[in-house]
């Protein structure tokens, strides 16, 4: 009987320990939501500059078009807002064969990220930030390559934020 109880306890522990959690991060769909479609361009905007170049040259309140890859940290998306960080495509992210569970955090090249990262917040026509999850709203995910159009703002440390009115998601990237 003790053996049977012990086996039952082991099986119960296994079943409970391997259960799925009800709490999960929103995931991207391959398409933007109906609410997000108004912010997503169907053709790629011309003359996009990489994030690193934009950080060097963009002036405060200047209209910009830049290209980057979503990432830069383990959590590049801002909870509750359609906002995220992008990194210059020239900065390599960790590859699958390096065994990195979160290659979008650029843990292998963090020294290169600082001068090649920008924050993107999707805004409406009045410049008000859009609430919701960017993954669902825009159909993006970590390491998606995006082309952003919007207005640049700079802080005292030289950080670049873009109030984006248009987002183009490069297919297959």
Q: What function would you assign to each model-found segment?
A:
Residues 1-17:
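Sec-dependent bacterial lipoprotein signal peptides
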Residues 18-173:
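OB-fold and OB-like single-stranded nucleic-acid-recognition modules
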């Amino acid at each position: 009987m003790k053996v049977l109880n012990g086996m039952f306890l082991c099986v119960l522990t296994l079943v409970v320990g391997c259960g799925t959690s009800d709490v999960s991060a929103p995931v991207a769909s391959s398409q933007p939501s109906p609410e997000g479609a108004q912010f997503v361009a169907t053709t790629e905007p011309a003359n996009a500059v990489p994030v690193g170049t934009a950080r060097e040259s963009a002036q405060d309140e200047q209209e910009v078009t830049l290209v980057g890859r979503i990432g830069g940290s383990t959590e590049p998306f801002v909870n509750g807002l359609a906002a995220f960080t992008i990194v210059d495509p020239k900065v390599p992210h960790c590859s699958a064969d390096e065994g990195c569970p979160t290659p979008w955090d650029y843990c292998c090249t963090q020294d290169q990220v600082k001068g090649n990262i920008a924050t993107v917040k999707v805004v409406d026509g009045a410049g008000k930030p859009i609430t919701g999850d960017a993954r669902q709203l825009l159909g993006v995910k970590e390491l998606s390559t995006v082309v952003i159009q919007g207005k640049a703002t700079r802080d005292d440390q030289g950080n670049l934020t873009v109030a984006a009115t248009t987002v183009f998601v490069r297919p297959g990237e």
